């Protein structure tokens, strides 16, 4: 019922207890309980005080009394913080609609009656969407436990078919493929959740979408030590995520490309502050960034009519070939 903009006086608390809970209490009881809550320190209760002079019942002399007023609960989250969390849930591409509603209701309960947030559009937002993996939260719990205890996991990985439903990935023999994985980190980017791990057959880093994982189990076998996986020791997660904008695994390269100045904002959106610019003629800039080579190639496709890849030469040739392949699709 309260926040910093909607505090309550002791009298209002008395009235609320009576009208909402059929509890009749006197002012002294309200004051005593408020002081207990405040002195306990467990409850985030803020308040103001005002001075009142009243006669002593025995002596008749005026006495100074400090009155608690303007009492309110200081919530853990501000409304703007709570709205940010709820927006993140609402527009997540991995969380099924039913789970979104449950989470949003729980988050909304962290505020008060004055907090306004409408989630009425969730169903319409998701209604035409593909089938969602309902095992996502269970997968997160299992992976969290496995990472904490340094254990391997096994799971099935899924891909969408033309029916917009998830289907187990198959091996070359047409049988369902089972993955034995060494898990290390869970990360989120672009509204999707990923597992940074190692596929046990190899010694490099791999990524898997959490919403594509099903039938996950923890194994009794310990995961590989990080020093057995190439690039995992001393891994800077923040930098790693900046270099892997689409979460392809593989090596990172120092990429250079020319772009018009009006694309600088878009470039910074993707590559953050890790990109450096050098001004060129004709309102162009030379951008330099360390990035996963496959991610860079995919990003360049979006702007193939505006940017020119310069280095490395192999990446420039790959981008050029992408344009030729795209053109061939439209030739008779």
What are these regions (language model features)?
Residues 5, 152, 192, 281-288:
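A generic structural signal for beta-strand entry/edge sites
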Residues 127-256:
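Core beta-strand-centered patch of the WYL/Sm-like small regulatory domain
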Residues 50-54, 187-189, 280:
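Short beta-strand micro-motifs enriched in acidic
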Residues 234-332:
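Polybasic (Lys/Arg-rich)
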Residues 70-167:
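Bulky hydrophobic/aromatic content
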Residues 63, 154, 194-196, 286, ...:
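General beta-strand recognition
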Residues 1-91, 174, 180, 327-332:
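Short, basic/aromatic recognition patches that contact phosphate-bearing ligands
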Residues 67-76, 198-201, 290-293:
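Secondary-structure transition/turn motif
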């Amino acid at each position: 019922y309260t926040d910093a903009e909607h505090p309550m006086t002791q009298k209002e608390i008395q009235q609320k207890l009576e009208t909402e809970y059929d509890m009749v209490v006197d002012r002294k009881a309200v004051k005593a309980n408020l002081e207990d809550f405040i002195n306990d320190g467990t409850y985030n209760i803020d308040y103001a005080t005002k001075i009142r002079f009243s006669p002593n019942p025995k002596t008749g002399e005026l006495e100074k009394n400090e009155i608690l007023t303007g009492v309110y609960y200081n919530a853990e989250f501000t409304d703007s913080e709570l709205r940010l969390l709820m927006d993140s849930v609402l527009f997540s591409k991995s969380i099924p609609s039913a789970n979104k509603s449950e989470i949003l209701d729980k988050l909304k309960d962290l505020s008060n009656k004055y907090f306004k947030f409408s989630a009425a559009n969730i169903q319409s937002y998701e209604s035409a969407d593909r089938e969602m993996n309902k095992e996502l939260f269970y997968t997160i719990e299992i992976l969290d436990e496995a990472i904490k205890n340094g254990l391997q996991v096994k799971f099935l990985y899924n891909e969408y078919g033309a029916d917009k439903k998830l289907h187990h990935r198959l091996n070359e023999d047409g049988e369902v493929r089972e993955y034995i994985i060494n898990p290390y980190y869970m990360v989120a980017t672009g509204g999707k959740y990923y597992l940074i791990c190692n596929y046990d057959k190899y010694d490099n880093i791999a990524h898997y979408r959490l919403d594509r994982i099903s039938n996950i189990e923890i194994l009794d076998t310990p995961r590989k030590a990080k020093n057995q996986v190439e690039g995992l020791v001393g891994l800077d997660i923040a930098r790693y995520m900046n270099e892997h904008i689409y979460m392809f695994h593989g090596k990172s390269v120092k990429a250079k490309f020319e772009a018009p100045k009006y694309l600088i904002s878009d470039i910074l959106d993707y590559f953050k502050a890790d990109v450096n610019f050098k001004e060129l003629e004709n309102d162009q800039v030379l951008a330099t960034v360390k990035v996963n080579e496959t991610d860079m190639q995919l990003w360049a496709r979006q702007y193939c009519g505006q940017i020119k890849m310069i280095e490395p030469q192999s990446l420039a040739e790959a981008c050029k070939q992408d344009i030729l392949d795209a053109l061939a699709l439209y030739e008779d």
